[in-house]
Regions:
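Conserved short alpha-helical segments that host acidic/polar catalytic motifs at enzyme active sites
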Residues: 1-223, 228-286, 292, 380
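Amphipathic alpha-helical
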Residues: 142-153, 293, 305-323
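Flexible loop/turn segments at secondary-structure boundaries
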Residues: 23-25, 88-89, 119, 189-190, ...
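PRPP-dependent phosphoribosyltransferase catalytic core
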Residues: 163, 178-179, 196, 214-220, ...
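Phosphate/diphosphate-binding loops
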Residues: 161, 209, 216-217, 221-225, ...
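Generic beta-strand/beta-sheet core signal
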Residues: 112, 175, 183-184, 195, ...
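Short, glycine/charge-rich flexible loops or terminal/linker lids adjacent to PRPP-binding catalytic cores
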Residues: 308-353, 364, 391-397
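A conserved beta-strand->alpha-helix junction
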Residues: 66, 136, 141, 311-322, ...
């Protein structure tokens, strides 16, 4: 299984769905492959052939589990949805893989969810007390349970009834006997786009999935919107009170694929601009700019262009290190970062180096890389981060550590600099981050993005999660 280092945020999940094509499951597999960066723990596909639903869910990468020629026989039908998972709630177990499926009174109902619900404990408690039995520890099952228990007569009304009870960040792709449905939460925290593949509507977390299958981008699913796709066409309803969209800023900073388009620009362009703004704010004398791969490459290019300091690939990242090499023995574990990163000495030796990365979470990986660069003969090592310090955990679908594990939550800049071992450590300001996103400044009254990891301003109530976390910590 693919393993991200502990000094970066973990991706959430990716969703995909397509309606009305004989190759639905094949195209869904390809779409999920392009969204693999959003989750590597497992993948699943549910298809519908007009009579029956078919489901395959497996732990591991998409290419390892859905690469055989029998996929159309395993997952027949003209409509399919899929999901790649990185667990933010629920353990990494096969039963927690999505899409989740249930046979309801009105027919089959499969759901793939990207995000995280914030009031699951209270809802689950009520459901269990009223007789519900849960088969998973995923918050997505709560959606199925609420839809099943709704007293509304029509399926869409049952879904709206459910959405009015849950709180949190969610982009949903739902498959029923006759419909493919896309849903985005009222703030639009998690992404969802609508496309078209030769007349077949497509839903996906990112435009890179549309590009993979040769589909045309139509538009983003709007915040608070339900898109209903049937043989009659595409219908849009907005059951919620209209509020301004506040997408997660980390989609542009880190999570989304560099080639995905958000707000009419590629994600690569935003990340390059982050590096450009970082250089504008920090005048550091150095001989070379080196990205910490792969996440720091775009920002390092922008930093290099603005500062006129040469860009070099001074650190090489191995793409072939899995959990097998990380976990089994202390002898192998102690090599840690060296298994994933190696230093190109010719770019480093006798030079003043500026390392660039997109974020720093715990600081453990950063400190080891700084040490490696010094050991390769660097005169000075400076570390630049192309976003503000991450001081607060996320509860909306990103797997972040708690406050005690976030280096910026418990340490000031001077302390962090000493901990990572660099000559200097500098971050992009919040205003600089917004400038890179195309805004003159952050709207303090109504921020354009969900940026709580930097500011601690959570747009959706998290009191229930904090209460549960506090209780668990005291046990």
């Amino acid at each position: 299984m693919y393993c991200r280092d502990s000094d970066h945020l973990k991706e959430e999940c990716g969703v995909f769905g397509i309606f009305g094509t004989e190759e639905a499951s094949v195209l869904t597999t390809l779409g999920l492959h392009s969204l693999q960066h959003r989750g590597q723990e497992g993948a699943g596909i549910v298809s519908f052939d007009g009579n029956n639903f078919h489901s395959v869910r497996k732990q591991g990468l998409v290419g390892d589990n859905f690469n055989n020629q029998n996929i159309l026989s395993l997952l027949p039908g003209k409509t399919a949805i899929g999901h790649v998972r990185y667990s933010t709630t629920g353990e990494s177990k096969p039963e927690n893989l999505q899409p989740l499926f249930a046979n309801l009174a009105l027919g089959g109902f499969a759901c793939a969810h990207n995000g995280n619900l914030t009031n699951t404990h209270s809802i689950k408690k009520k459901l269990v007390e009223s007789g519900s039995i849960f088969q998973t520890s995923s918050d997505t099952e709560i959606i199925l349970q609420l839809v099943a228990r709704s007293h509304k007569k029509k399926l869409i009304d049952k879904l709206i009834d459910t959405l009015n009870q849950i709180k949190g960040a969610y982009s949903l792709v739902i498959l029923t006997n006759k419909k493919l449905i896309g849903v985005r939460d009222p703030f639009g925290i998690r992404p969802l786009v609508l496309g078209d593949k030769d007349g077949s509507p497509v839903l996906a977390s990112e435009t890179c999935a549309l590009d993979m299958i040769g589909a045309k981008y139509i538009r983003d699913v709007e915040n608070g919107e339900i898109v209903i796709i049937t043989e009659k066409g595409i219908e849009s309803i907005k059951p919620f009170k209209n509020i301004p969209e506040r997408p997660c800023i980390f989609e542009r900073i880190y999570f989304a694929s560099p080639d995905s388009i958000v707000g009419n620009k590629t994600v690569y362009t935003y990340r390059k601009s982050l590096g450009f703004e970082l250089a504008k704010e920090n005048n550091i004398s150095a001989d070379v700019v080196v990205p910490i791969p792969d996440s720091g490459v775009s920002a390092a290019l922008g930093f290099s262009q603005k500062s006129s300091i040469p860009f070099e690939l001074g650190i090489i990242r191995s793409h072939y290190v899995g959990r097998t090499f990380i976990e089994p023995s202390q002898t192998i574990r102690q090599f840690g970062v060296k298994l994933k990163h190696s230093v190109n000495r010719s770019c480093i030796e006798d030079k003043r180096v500026i390392l660039i990365d997109d974020s720093i979470v715990r600081g453990t990986t950063a400190s080891k890389i700084v040490k490696m660069v010094y050991e390769a003969g660097a005169k000075e090592v400076h570390l630049g981060i192309s976003c503000p310090p991450i001081k607060h955990p996320d509860f909306y679908g990103i797997d972040t550590p708690n406050y005690n594990e976030l280096i910026a939550s418990k340490s000031n800049i001077e302390e962090m600099t000493e901990l990572v071992g660099a000559k200097s450590l500098f971050f992009l300001s919040l205003d600089g981050t917004y400038k890179a996103m195309g805004y003159n400044e952050r709207n303090k009254e109504l921020p354009q993005f969900t940026d709580h990891c930097f500011t601690g301003e959570y747009p959706i109530d998290i009191s229930e999660i904090l209460k549960i976390n506090s209780y668990n910590a005291s046990r």
